[in-house]
Structures are given as structure tokens and as C-alpha cells.
Curated annotation (Swiss-Prot):
A single GO molecular function term of this UniProt record: pyridoxal phosphate binding
Residues annotated as signal peptide: none
Quaternary organization: Homotetramer; dimer of active dimers.
Catalytic function, reaction form: L-methionine + H2O = methanethiol + 2-oxobutanoate + NH4(+); L-homocysteine + H2O = 2-oxobutanoate + hydrogen sulfide + NH4(+) + H(+)
One Pfam short name: Cys_Met_Meta_PP
Cofactor(s) annotated in UniProt: pyridoxal 5'-phosphate
Organism of derivation: Porphyromonas gingivalis (strain ATCC BAA-308 / W83)
Family: Belongs to the trans-sulfuration enzymes family. L-methionine gamma-lyase subfamily.
N6-(pyridoxal phosphate)lysine PTM positions: K212
Name the UniProt record assigns to this protein: L-methionine gamma-lyase
Name of the gene this protein is made from: mgl
């Protein structure tokens, strides 16, 4: 199928057929090119490839057919010109940010972030002379107030991890782009391009932890950066090649490409299950509050309808009784897996205050609006009645 015809096709068709590459034996499934290096026909050809005068592969850290295939697939789904793959979500995020900033530059970021992103921005970049200002991106005026003459990047997660706050991507992009040289980078892991496409709303760069929904089966660690072709070349040739070395393996690229073929149908079922679970949680007496974009009670329900095609499958909720109640709930579940990460076929649950965000001070958690009783739930693909029965058993133990 020609690329121009594929671009006019539906999402599932692009997810299945996008990035197809020719192979010598006519294999329907993309072969795995499990090699560290590639052979040149002549010394002259090797010279041309290193000089960038001829397309082709040199060394898998610099590129591999499996990585190229899945990069093209994701770029097509996100509506970007190109994509770069990485060995983890943080590998993608750090590679993407390193090529945007230098010592003396400034970043504005959401104050509620994935724990490792928070650490990279606040504890990592500061060692190299990059300043970071954290703001509540639910209020675009806070972003505008934080931008300085040396600001180079606005970094967003929406929905935010772990409390599900949304950011109006278009509003923030409109503000950022009034200032010369300021780019907007959005972590689209929670939504995937099936639910939200930040580039269409004005973002310059999209990052993903492909460990989550893109792969969808809990057996890969990987990440992506999507954006303009010139920028992605810099991410690959400077960010990944020289600064982080965080290249994706061919086998992981193969698994992600295979997983993405079912992305649409998986996301639809994830979201159906999550809607039903959220409605159950909202009625349980041990639950103080539920934060889910698909509930009319969600404070940003209208924004969710505006920029998300579906509400997603991540739920945050607060249990009555604080930290001890949160831990007790974790220890009284049998089907839901007590584990970090998200986007797997299995339902995963965790208590940030005692788990993922335990290395941070109570003040840092409070600044990110992570309460002691907050629970994060990644709703899986099990029968929803079984998920609810397990949650009911655990929550009933708190009464």
C-alpha cells in the first residue's frame, strides 16, 4: 500500500500497515534484524554513509531497520514528520530535552510529573546549569508568568501522573509560541495518539514511554520522540547517539510494532472498562474522591471532551484514612497487580505515597498535589466484573 494512500486510511489501518519495509524473502511479518553492525560494499560506501551522503545503516545505535519501521509507524499515527526511538521513556525524554537546552537556559514544566521525569528536571538538569520552574499547568496564565527571556522549553504531561490533572494543550502552545524560541513538549503516554494528538493542537514535540500502551503487554522498556524532521535528526545523531546512548533494541522495536497493530481495539476496551470501574469507585463509601476524565464530576470534564477522543484508562482516587488506608488496600487485593507502570493487559494498582513517590519529601509530594491516600489504577483488559469484585473486596476492608 502506498504511503500517500495509507495516510488517508483509518487509524487501525495505519497502525497495522504503517512503516512497512521490504525484505528479501517476502515475509508478511517484519523480520528481526538482530545485529550490532552492518557491512559496507566498499570503503567508499562506508565513507558516504558516515558523511550522510548516502542512506543506509552503519551501527544499530545509529539506526536499525526494525527501529526505522516502528518510528515511521508512530510518526504516522501522531501526525509528525519523523520519530526517534529510545531504550526507555526516560531515555526518550532526556535525549529530547538535552538537544533543546544548554547551560543558562530555562524550562517551564508542570509541577505534577512522573517521578523520574520530575527527578531529571529538578535534580538532574540543575547540575548542568539549566533552571526549571514548576507551575500548575491547569492554569495557562501560570505558564505565561513563568516564561523568561532564556526559556527554551515548556514541558507538559496531560493527564498528569499520578493525579490525572489535564492541561489545555492548545492554550499553553498559543502562549508559548508568542515567545521566540520556546518549544512545547508533551508526554502523550497516558493517551496514545488514538485518544489525543498534541501536535495537532500546536505542540512541537511529543514523547512516549512505549513501555505502556503502545506496546501494551508489559514485556518491553522503550520510548519515542516525535516532531519535525530536522529536530528528530538532532535527537538521533546528538541526543541518542552521543549524549545518552539510549537506543532501542531491534527485538524491542519488533515487539512494539506488533503491539501497536492492536492499539485501537485495546484502547477502546481499556477505556470501556475504566469508565465502568470509575463509576463503581465513585459510589463506594471508602472512597473520598475519584479523578477520571470520563466522569461528569471530574473538574476538567469539558476540557477532556475537547482534546481527548476517549477518557483513557487511568484512574486516580483517594481513599479515606490516608497513607495507612492506602497501604491496607494494596495488601487486600488478589486480581489487581500491585505494580508500577501502566498500560498493560493486566490491571495494575499502586499507592504513590508509599511506593513510586516515596523517595520524595512530603513537601515535594504536597507541592505536586499527591495526597497520602491517593491511589493510581491502570485498568486492564480483564472482565470488568472481576476487576470490580477485587476492588470491592479491598475497599470493603477499609470500612
Amino acid at each position: 500500500m502506498k504511503k500517500e494512500d495509507l495516510m488517508r486510511s483509518g487509524f487501525a489501518t495505519r497502525a497495522i500497515h504503517g512503516g512497512a519495509i521490504e525484505n528479501a524473502f517476502g515475509c508478511l511479518a517484519t523480520p528481526i534484524y538482530q545485529t550490532s553492525t552492518f557491512v559496507f560494499d566498499t570503503a567508499e560506501q562506508g565513507g558516504r554513509r558516515f558523511a550522510g551522503e548516502e542512506d543506509g545503516y552503519i551501527y544499530t545505535r545509529l539506526g536499525n531497520p526494525n527501529c526505522t519501521q516502528v518510528e515511521e509507524k508512530l510518526a504516522m499515527l501522531e501526525g509528525g514528520e519523523a520519530a526517534a526511538s529510545a531504550s526507555s521513556g526516560i531515555g526518550a525524554i532526556s535525549s529530547a530535552i538535552w538537544v533543546c537546552v544548554k547551560a543558562g537556559d530555562h524550562i517551564v514544566a508542570g509541577k505534577t510529573l512522573y517521578g523520574c521525569t520530575f527527578a531529571f528536571l529538578t535534580h538532574g538538569l540543575s547540575r548542568y546549569g539549566v533552571e526549571v520552574t514548576l507551575v500548575d499547568t491547569r492554569h495557562p496564565e501560570e505558564v505565561e508568568a513563568a516564561i523568561r527571556p532564556n526559556t527554551k522549553l515548556v514541558y507538559l504531561e496531560t493527564p498528569a501522573n499520578p493525579n490525572m490533572y489535564l492541561t489545555d494543550i492548545k492554550a499553553v502552545c498559543d502562549i508559548a509560541h508568542k515567545h521566540e524560541g520556546v518549544r512545547v513538549m508533551v508526554d502523550n503516554t497516558y493517551c496514545t495518539p488514538y485518544i489525543c494528538r498534541p501536535l495537532e493542537l500546536g505542540a512541537d514535540i511529543v514523547v512516549h514511554s512505549a513501555t505502556k500502551y503502545l506496546n501494551g503487554h508489559g514485556d518491553v522498556i522503550a520510548g519515542f520522540v516525535v516532531g519535525k524532521e530536522d529536530y528528530i535528526k538532532e535527537v538521533k545523531l546528538v541526543g541518542v547517539k552521543d549524549l545518552t546512548g539510549a537506543n532501542m533494541s531491534p527485538f524491542d522495536a519488533y515487539l512494539i510494532s506488533r503491539g501497536m497493530k492492536t492499539l485501537q481495539i485495546r484502547m477502546e476496551q481499556h477505556c470501556r472498562n475504566a469508565q465502568t470501574v470509575a463509576e463503581f469507585l465513585e459510589k463506594h463509601p471508602a472512597v473520598e474522591a475519584v479523578y477520571f476524565p470520563g466522569l461528569p464530576s471530574f473538574p476538567q470534564y469539558e476540557l477532556a471532551k475537547k482534546q481527548m477522543a476517549l477518557p483513557g484508562a487511568m484512574i486516580a482516587f483517594e481513599v479515606k484514612g490516608g497513607c495507612e488506608a492506602g497501604k491496607k488496600l494494596m495488601n487486600n487485593l488478589h486480581l489487581c497487580s500491585l505494580a508500577v507502570s501502566l498500560g498493560d493487559t493486566e490491571t495494575l494498582i499502586q499507592h504513590p505515597a508509599s511506593m513510586t513517590h516515596s523517595p520524595y519529601t512530603p513537601e515535594e509530594r504536597a507541592a505536586s498535589d499527591i495526597s497520602e491516600g491517593l491511589v493510581r489504577l491502570s485498568v486492564g483488559l480483564e472482565n470488568v466484573e472481576d476487576i470490580i469484585a477485587d476492588l470491592k473486596h479491598g475497599l470493603d476492608s477499609l470500612i
